[in-house]
Each structure stands twice: as structure tokens, then as C-alpha cells.
From Swiss-Prot:
PANTHER family: EUKARYOTIC TRANSLATION INITIATION FACTOR 4E TRANSPORTER. The gene is 4E-T. GO terms for cellular component: cytoplasm; cytosol; nucleus; P-body. Residues 201-211, 248-263, 934-953 have a biased composition (Polar residues). Coiled coil: none annotated. Keywords: Cytoplasm, Nucleus. InterPro entries: eIF4E-T. A motif (YXXXXLphi motif) lies at residues 10-16. This is Eukaryotic translation initiation factor 4E transporter. eIF4E1-binding protein that regulates translation and stability of mRNAs in processing bodies (P-bodies). Probably plays a role in P-bodies to coordinate the storage of translationally inactive mRNAs in the cytoplasm and prevent their degradation. Acts as a binding platform for multiple RNA-binding proteins. Required for the formation of P-bodies. Disulfide bonds: none annotated. Transmembrane segments: none annotated. Residues 154-182, 196-277, 289-320, 354-391, 921-960 are annotated as: Disordered. It comes from Drosophila melanogaster.
């Protein structure tokens, strides 16, 4: 053993070889020397049996030392976990160096026979099987791996070459060494070329491609953790160069030439980007278009091999690798591997150039033929348009022969157009006649191919419709109706000029709106005549279906309108246009032609105060008539009145009917007095518009919906417990009756009480008084301080009288002070202009009260009645009705603006009539019951009578009364100023009561009305 072996007695490669499973169980060959046995690294067994077993094991596992088995085991182990090329190179190099010690030891021992003889003669040959856990060289790996090229190219190069050559020469001599030599040959062959073949089989699938770890972005493949992007190409280039160096000294000609062929083939596969040798040109798609760029590609490949482009990560190297071998889709492995790359798209421009040459010749012929056909078609279309225009303008029905002629035109045009498309079916036809400026596309010729009526498609009214600002497409819609049967008479003249024209989109929308605005007041005969005329005209299929839809909508509207459940919402601007319909309605009411189910819903306006009041009044009258006829029994009405599930409004109507029916039996003259009812129905609704304007939010609902809403007024909803309403209930209910009676059936009790006290004429006008009191919003301050004048001393004796009576708290002349207690403070929503009729609230004049003290009992009785009705009706109206108001601010303002414009003058007249009636009730001897308008002295007296209030009495009453809470809310200075009349006059129309304001705050999360 010379010094060279001593220096390499336990080399780094031996430690590297311990990483393999097969090698780690075997002792390195150099460990058999006696110098190493003293170190005690290895456990030594000197048993002969163990030696024989170990020798058999070593002889059996000689080929275990060969890298074939290790490579096979490596391939199997690497298939599960993808390792980098660097780790593969480390293992192969360790295997290489370990293999080079085998021939030297075999030369010493001289073959298997010498081995066996020496082992059997008891030489101290150590056991090859070791415990690999006794030494761990894994922590030495990084340092060895960094210097592996220095080791391979340095001291061991001569020794390795000598070993290989001696092994090769030895392998050609004897039988048993020849097996070893062939083993070594194949071992080196495998060392150099198993890895490329392994790369071949693994690069076919990018999952196992360890030779090139690049993979397509987004393909879902994970990059290996040990892969380094920076010097990867350098490693592959160095590996290929070293493989060439290692194969060149081998003298084995056939195997080396075969391996060089394999290596060059693999290199061409790896770096050329295509299967050059394997795949014929016909099957590769990219050879059809890449022939120009092959030289450029080769330059790119040379640059890649030499490693001059370290950052170009062989973007197109994988496209053809697995192309026809494993049939993997191209997008799996091909494509960009980093975000810095771009994709080349080849061949499309060449394809387009080739196709353009073949297509342009056909196009020229086609365009010439198309021009001829289009010119002929245009002349035919002009003729057919003239015929159709004549037929449309002068005849309503097209004759059958003209229809056949136009149909023939349609068929020929279809045939011509299809014949144009057929000559070149196999090629993509790109007919663009707009490229030729002479041949513009005729849309009429194209659209006439549709099997519609030509009279619908082409007419001469397109200029008109364009001037009207209609849509481009509106000329293919024709109005089949002479006039829409849903129109009002005012709309018919406006649409008369469009009878034979084609309606625009706006006209169609207007027709849809008119279907909603349909009313039965219009003569139905005209609508039926319109329909019969329309059905005679020729109708296209599409427009016929559209018109049928309109007719269905109209019939639905006709079905809904007799019922009381579908009243459409219409703008206030439409109300001004249809005031004459209201006059028609009042005329029919006075004539007695309008029945109850058709009430107020047939009118296309929203239910104003007059409509709601008239409907309620006519319900009462209709029920009274049925009572007289015997259709409805008195007992049934009483049962309904006692039924707790009956809505409050229904109970109100029933109670009124029972009262009037009982009084009509006593005084049958009243029911037959038409003048009183005429005054009520026509004049009274304008005076109480404020009260019923609160029900305007129910304009889209029917009467039973209103009743259901009102029925919730008695329920303890959160709306019933605003602070002002609770305060008003605490003070108002103590005046006349116990509150428990009001909780059960307040309206009925009050009406029964009034039936015992007051006369017939008072009962007839009782809803008017109730509504009049409900008109005034609840004013804490300001109600009753409208016109406080200098005549404060007139009623001082009457004041002292009425204060002594327990029932009466205020004078009869101070009607508004009743409301001054029960109505809330106004919240001003507009200017401070005073209401024109606000001073006319008192029905009793000062001079008549002073001149006639005889009628003081009548006065007290009337005041008691007013007080009773007020205390309950204010409870009902401000609770039951106002509770159902969603947002009183919006519609209150809206309705007030509209109502002030239209009904202002009639308000004053009707109020004068009402207060004249009230005055005649309280003074029957002085004023005969003339049903007409009251004399002009009433208005002056009313203004006088409004100033009868005593401010000192009011202030004393407000502060001293234990039931009044005003002193808790307002300072004495403000109360004194208010009682002195220094607060501004309030426009009641623009005032919102405190109670309504509190409810609107509670409703602030509800529906918002603009």
C-alpha cells in the first residue's frame, strides 16, 4: 500500500457514498486496513461464520456497488419527491469516486477466487455490513458539495483514469474479471448516460422533469425548493461538458458512439425547442410557419447552450418535448415560465396573406355581382314601396293580388340574398359592400325579407316621425286604432292626425298611461266603435300581439274600476285638466243616477275631500234607503254596531244611519228636503277639506282599506301615546263623560246622546259640525286668538253665568277656545299670512246674544252638544284618522297648495252657508230656515263674534285650572302675550299641529314622501 492510498484512505467521497442506502450498510473498502481498526469506528466480528456470510454478501453485492442499481433506486426515490439536478449530480459524483476504488482493491486481491481464498483463510477482513447510525455525514454535505468540482478535477484525475483503463484492460482478459470489466463499462456508461435517458423519460411529463425545472405559470405545478433560478443554466452546461470529458477517454467504441448519439439527440431535444430527430416535419404544426425563423432559433439555442443568456429560462424549450410521445396538452408544459416572457404567435399573418390572395379575386367578382343585384333590388323595392304607400294612404285594406305581388317580391329578394351567399361556401365569405362607396347597404331591401306586411314596413311617414323626435325604430310599428278607446275627448283630436301613421314610443307610453286613466264616464259606444274599426284593418303579427297586450291591460282596468280596490295615482296636473269631470259627477249625484259601488273610484282624479265626504254621505243615505225598503233590518245594524270586530268607520256610519233613521220617523220632512242635502253635498265638502285631506294618502286604496286603517285607531299602537295626545286625553275626557264609555263605543254613545238632545235639523248637519271642528289643528297657543278685538266686555255676564255651570267651561261664543284647549301648538310651514276664513269660525253673533237673553237655554244646550261632540270627535279624528297618516308633512303641504288654488272661493261661500245654518238652529225665531245663502250681515257679525273672548278669563282659567297643563309648558309672559293677542295670526292651512308633528317624528323611519 503506497502513500497515495494512505492519503486517500478515508476520503470525502466515501463519506458521500454513505448517503445511499446500499452503500451505508457496507463498509468502505479502505476501512479494511489495520490502521483504521484502531480507531474503533466499526464494530468488528471475528467469527468465521460471520466472515463467510459477509464474504458471500460482499460477492453477491458487488454489483450493488455499481451505479446502475443506485441509479435505479435513485429514480424510484426521486419519482416520489422531485429533486433538483444538483442533488442528482452530487449523488452520481459520489458514486463515481466510490466506484474507482473497486478495481485497485480487486487488483490486490486478484479476482473473486483470491477474495474467497483470502477470506476463508481467516484474513482479518472486516465485516462489510455496518450500522449507518454510528456515523452521520449529513452535516458535512454542504461543504463537500461546494468543492466537488475541485476534487474531481484535481488529485484524483490521474488515479481515476488509471483505474478505468486498468479495469477496461483487465475486463478483456479472464472470465471472471471480464464480467467485472463489463460491469464497470456499463457502470460508466450508466453514469454518463443514464441521467440523460432519465431526463428523457422524466421530461416527457413536466411533473417529473428534473432536467429543466421551469414550468408554465399558472399550470399549478410547484417549483422545487432547491431549484435556483440564477445559475441553473450554468449547471446544465457544465454537466454536459463534463459528460463529454468523461466519455472521451473511454476506448469502448461502440458504446461510446451510441452514447454520444444518444447524448446529442437528447441535447437537440433539450435545447432546440422541437423534436428534431424524432418527429417528422409533417406532424409538427409549427414547421409549417417556422421555416423562416429556423436560423434565428438556432442562434438562440446556441446562445442558450453557451450560457450567455442566464435569464432567458428556455421559454420555448419544452413545447415539442412531449409532443407525440405522451400526448400531453401543450399548455401543460409549454408557454411562459416567468412573468418577464412574451408569447410569440406565428403563422396567422402568413395564413391571412395566403387567404387574402385567394379571396380578393373572388371578392371582386362577388362585389360586382352584388352591385348589380342590389341595384335591381333597390329598383324593385322602390316600386314595392310606392305600391305599399299608395295602398296605405288611400285604401285601408290591401287587395289580395297586391299582397301576392309583394309576397313575390319578398320571396325573390330572399332568393337573391341567399344566392349571393352560396357561391363560395367552403371559404369564409367576407362580403363588405360598404368598402365600395357606391354600393351602400340598403336596409329596406334587407328588412323587406322579413315576412311582414309591406304596408307596415315601408311608408312615407318616416319624415313626419323623425320630425316629431321619435325613435328610429318607430316606423315599423303601426297604430291599428283609429283612436284609442281609453282616451279622453281632449286627447282624441291630438291623435287624430296619427290614425294612419306609426306611433312613436312616446305615444305607446301615453297609451299605457291612458289605460290606467280609463274612466267609465266616457261613452262606451265610442270605444266599441273604435274597436270594430280597428279589427277591420290588416294587422301584422307582431303589432297585433302588442295591441292585444294593450287591450288586455285595458280590460283589466275596466274590471278593476267598478270595484272599490283600484284607484290609480295620477299627478295633480291631471286634476286641473279634468275638473269638468267633477262637475259631471256632482250633476249625476244631484240627479240621483250614481249608485254607491261606483262612487269616487270611477273619477280619474285622486279622492279629494269632496269625494271622500260624498262617498261617506252617500253610504249613509244608501243605507237609510235600504232600511226604508226593508232590505236591512234595524236589529242587524245594532248587532253590527255592538260587534267589536267592526271597523270604527263602519260603526260611525251605522250610528249616523240609526240616528237619522230614528229622527226621520219622527220628522219625515227632513229626508225629503233636497235643498239641505244639495247644500251638504256640493258646498260642505270644500269647507272640511282640511279634515279629509288627511285621508289623501289612501288614494290608491279602496274604501274598505280606509276602514281597516281607521279601525286601528282604537288599538294601543305607539302612535296613540305621543305626549300631546296623552295630555289631551287626560284633559278632554273629564268634561262630559267617564272615559270608559268612550273606550267602548265613543261615536255611538255620542250620537245617541245627541239624538236625545238636539232636533232634526241639527242631526242632519251633525257631520258638518264634526268635520268643522276637526278642521282646526290642535293649537296650544294661537287657536282662538285669531281676532281678539276691543269688544272684550260684551260677554262678561255670560261668562260669569257659564263659569257657574259645571258642564260649560267656556262661552258659546268662544268656539275656538274649545279647540284652544284640545289642539296643539302650530308649527309654521309657510308665511304668516292669515287665513281668509279663519275669522269666520263663530256661528253666534254678539248683538244677537246680547239682544236676546231669552235664548240662553238654547245657547247652553247647543254649547253642551258642541262640547260633547268635540271631546269625542276630536279624540276620534285626531287619533283614529291621524294615526294612519304615514307622513303628514308631505301630502299636507301638497294638498294645501292645490286646494287653495281651486276651492278657495267656494270655501268661503260654503262656510257662510254652514254657519248660517248653525245660527238658524240656535235662533229659530229670528232666522227662518232658508236653504240658500245667508245674508251679508252674517259675515260681519261672525268677525265681530270672534272678538268676544275675554283674555283675563282665559289667562285665569289656564293658570288656575288643575286640569290644564299649559302653565307647565309655557312661561307666564308668553301666555300673557298670547292672551293679549300679540302673537301673529296663523294660517291654519300651513300650520302643523304638535300632535301631528310628534306622530311624524315617530314615523320618520317610515315611507318618505317627496
Amino acid at each position: 500500500m503506497d502513500t497515495s492510498k494512505i492519503s486517500a484512505r478515508y476520503s470525502k467521497v466515501d463519506l458521500l457514498a454513505l448517503r445511499y442506502e446500499g452503500k451505508s450498510r457496507q463498509r468502505p473498502q479502505c476501512s479494511t486496513r489495520l490502521e483504521l481498526q484502531t480507531l474503533g469506528f466499526w464494530k468488528i466480528n471475528l467469527n468465521t461464520a460471520a466472515l463467510t456470510v459477509s464474504s458471500a454478501y460482499s460477492n453477491q453485492n458487488k454489483n450493488r456497488l455499481s451505479p446502475e442499481a443506485d441509479n435505479s433506486s435513485l429514480i424510484c426515490s426521486n419519482s416520489s419527491s422531485i429533486s433538483s439536478r444538483r442533488a442528482m449530480r452530487n449523488r452520481e459524483r459520489a458514486n463515481n469516486y466510490y466506484q474507482r476504488f473497486v478495481p485497485t482493491d480487486s487488483l490486490l486481491i486478484s479476482g473473486e477466487d483470491k477474495d474467497k481464498d483470502a477470506l476463508s483463510h481467516g484474513q482479518p477482513y472486516k465485516l462489510n455490513i455496518i450500522d449507518h447510525r454510528s456515523i452521520s455525514s449529513s452535516h458535512l454535505m454542504p461543504a463537500f458539495a461546494k468543492r466537488r468540482f475541485v476534487i474531481s478535477k484535481g488529485s484524483n484525475s490521474e488515479e481515476s483514469n488509471e483505474g478505468i483503463n486498468t479495469c477496461a484492460s483487465k475486463g478483456k482478459a479472464a472470465s471472471s474479471p471480464s464480467r467485472k470489466g463489463s460491469e464497470l463499462d456499463t457502470a460508466e456508461t450508466c453514469l454518463n448516460f443514464v441521467q440523460p435517458d432519465h431526463d428523457q423519460c422524466m421530461s416527457s411529463s413536466p411533473t417529473f422533469s428534473t432536467s429543466r425545472q421551469e414550468r408554465r405559470i399558472g399550470s399549478g405545478r410547484l417549483l422545487p425548493r432547491s431549484d435556483n433560478w440564477d445559475y441553473k443554466n450554468e449547471k446544465t452546461v457544465e454537466a454536459s461538458i463534463e459528460n463529454e470529458k468523461e466519455t472521451s477517454p473511454n476506448g469502448s467504441g461502440s458504446t461510446s458512439s451510441l452514447n454520444q448519439h444518444n447524448q446529442s439527440q437528447h441535447r437537440s431535444r433539450t435545447f432546440s425547442g422541437r423534436l428534431v430527430e424524432r418527429v417528422p416535419e409533417v406532424t409538427d404544426r409549427r414547421f409549417q410557419y417556422d421555416s423562416k425563423k429556423s436560423f434565428d432559433r438556432q442562434g438562440i439555442n446556441n446562445r442558450r447552450i453557451s450560457g450567455k443568456e442566464p435569464f432567458s429560462t428556455q421559454s420555448r424549450s419544452k413545447r415539442g418535448n412531449s409532443y407525440l410521445i405522451h400526448e400531453e396538452p401543450e399548455w401543460f408544459s409549454a408557454g411562459p415560465k416567468s412573468q418577464l416572457e412574451t408569447i410569440d404567435l406565428h403563422g396567422f399573418e402568413d395564413l391571412e396573406k395566403n387567404e387574402e390572395r385567394s379571396v380578393t379575386e373572388d371578392k371582386n367578382n362577388q362585389i360586382q355581382q352584388l352591385d348589380k343585384n342590389l341595384d335591381a333590388q333597390a329598383s324593385k323595392d322602390e316600386a314595392s314601396m310606392r305600391n305599399s304607400n299608395d295602398s296605405l294612404n288611400f285604401r285601408e285594406v290591401i287587395p289580395s293580388d297586391e299582397k301576392k305581388h309583394t309576397d313575390e317580391n319578398v320571396v325573390t329578394s330572399i332568393q337573391n340574398s341567399t344566392d349571393l351567399g352560396h357561391p363560395n361556401k367552403n371559404k369564409p365569405i367576407q362580403m363588405q359592400p360598404s368598402q365600395n362607396p357606391e354600393s351602400e347597404f340598403n336596409f329596406d331591401a334587407f328588412l323587406n325579407m322579413h315576412p311582414l306586411d309591406n304596408s307596415v314596413l315601408s311608408n312615407d311617414e318616416t319624415g313626419k316621425s323623425d320630425s316629431k323626435g321619435t325613435s328610429r325604430f318607430s316606423r315599423w310599428f303601426r297604430q291599428k286604432e283609429a283612436a284609442n278607446n281609453n282616451e279622453f275627448p281632449g286627447f282624441r283630436e291630438s291623435h287624430a292626425q296619427e290614425k294612419r301613421g306609426i306611433p312613436s314610443v312616446k305615444d305607446l307610453e301615453a297609451q299605457m298611461i291612458k289605460v290606467d286613466m280609463r274612466t267609465d264616464l266616457i261613452n262606451p259606444i265610442a270605444g266599441s266603435l273604435c274597436q270594430t274599426v280597428q279589427m277591420e284593418k290588416p294587422i301584422a303579427r307582431d303589432t297585433e300581439a302588442f295591441k292585444k297586450l294593450l287591450q288586455q291591460l285595458g280590460s283589466q282596468a275596466r274590471q278593476h274600476h267598478p270595484c272599490n280596490d283600484d284607484c290609480r295615482t295620477i299627478n295633480l296636473s291631471n286634476i286641473a285638466n279634468h275638473v269638468h269631470l267633477e262637475s259631471k259627477l256632482h250633476q249625476k249625484i244631484n240627479d240621483g243616477h250614481l249608485q254607491q259601488p261606483e262612487l269616487s273610484v270611477n273619477v280619474p282624479t285622486m279622492p279629494t275631500s269632496s269625494h271622500v265626504f260624498l262617498q261617506k254621505r252617500l253610504e249613509i243615505q244608501h243605507l237609510i234607503q235600504r232600511l226604508h225598503c226593508g232590505d236591512v233590518s234595524h236589529d242587524f245594524l245594532e248587532k253590527e254596531l255592538d260587534n267589536p270586530s267592526t271597523p270604527a268607520a263602519t260603526k260611525d256610519v251605522i250610528a249616523t244611519v240609526l240616528n237619522e233613521y230614528s229622527h226621520s220617523k219622527r220628522n219625515p220632512v227632513v229626508t225629503g228636503d233636497p235643498n239641505i242635502f244639495t247644500q251638504q253635498s256640493f258646498l260642505q265638502p270644500q269647507s272640511v277639506h282640511q279634515h279629509y285631506s288627511q285621508e289623501l294618502h289612501s288614494q290608491n286604496t279602496a274604501n274598505h282599506t280606509i276602514n281597516q286603517l281607521i279601525s286601528h285607531g282604537n288599538s294601543p299602537t305607539p302612535l296613540a301615546f305621543t305626549p300631546t295626545s296623552v295630555l289631551r286625553k287626560m284633559t278632554a275626557d273629564k268634561d262630559t263623560q267617564s272615559p270608559s264609555t268612550y273606550c267602548q263605543n265613543p261615536q255611538y254613545h255620542v250620537h245617541q246622546q245627541n239624538a236625545k238632545q238636539v232636533g232634526t235639523r241639527e242631526n242632519v248637519l251633525e257631520p258638518q259640525l264634526t268635520a268643522t271642528m276637526a278642521v282646526q289643528p290642535r293649537m296650544i297657543l294661537g287657536g282662538g286668538n285669531f281676532a281678539i278685538g276691543q269688544n272684550n266686555q260684551h260677554l262678561s255676564p255670560n261668562m260669569s253665568q257659564s263659569r257657574n255651570q259645571q258642564v260649560l267651561k267656556w262661552t258659546s261664543g268662544n268656539m275656538q277656545m274649545v279647540h284652544g284647549k284640545t289642539f296643539g301648538r302650530p308649527i309654521l310651514k309657510g308665511g304668516l299670512n292669515s287665513m281668509p276664513h279663519s275669522n269666520s269660525a263663530l256661528p253666534f253673533t254678539a248683538h244677537k246674544i246680547e239682544m236676546q237673553p231669552i235664548h240662553q237655554p238654547h245657547l247652553q244646550q247647543q254649547q253642551h252638544r258642541f262640547k260633547a261632540v268635540q271631546s269625542v270627535e276630536s279624540n276620534l279624528n285626531t287619533e283614529s284618522v291621524h294615526q294612519n297618516i304615514t307622513s303628514p308633512v308631505g301630502w299636507h303641504q301638497l294638498y294645501m297648495q292645490h286646494q287653495q288654488q281651486h276651492h278657495h272661493t267656494r270655501q268661503q261661500l260654503s262656510q257662510r252657508v254652514i254657519y248660517g245654518e248653525m245660527h238658524r238652529q240656535s235662533n229659530p225665531q229670528m232666522s227662518p230656515p232658508v236653504p240658500g245663502f245667508s245674508d251679508s250681515s252674517d259675515s260681519g257679525n261672525v268677525i265681530k263674534a270672534n272678538s268676544l273672548t275675554s283674555p283675563s278669563y282665559q289667562r285665569d282659567e289656564r293658570i288656575s285650572s288643575p286640569t290644564n297643563q299649559l302653565a307647565q309648558w309655557f312661561s307666564p309672559e308668553l301666555l300673557a302675550k298670547a292672551s293679549a293677542g300679540k302673537l301673529p295670526l296663523l294660517n291654519v292651512n300651513q300650520a302643523l299641529s304638535l300632535e301631528e308633528f310628534e306622530r311624524s317624528i315617530q314615523h320618520s323611519s317610515g315611507v318618505v314622501h317627496n
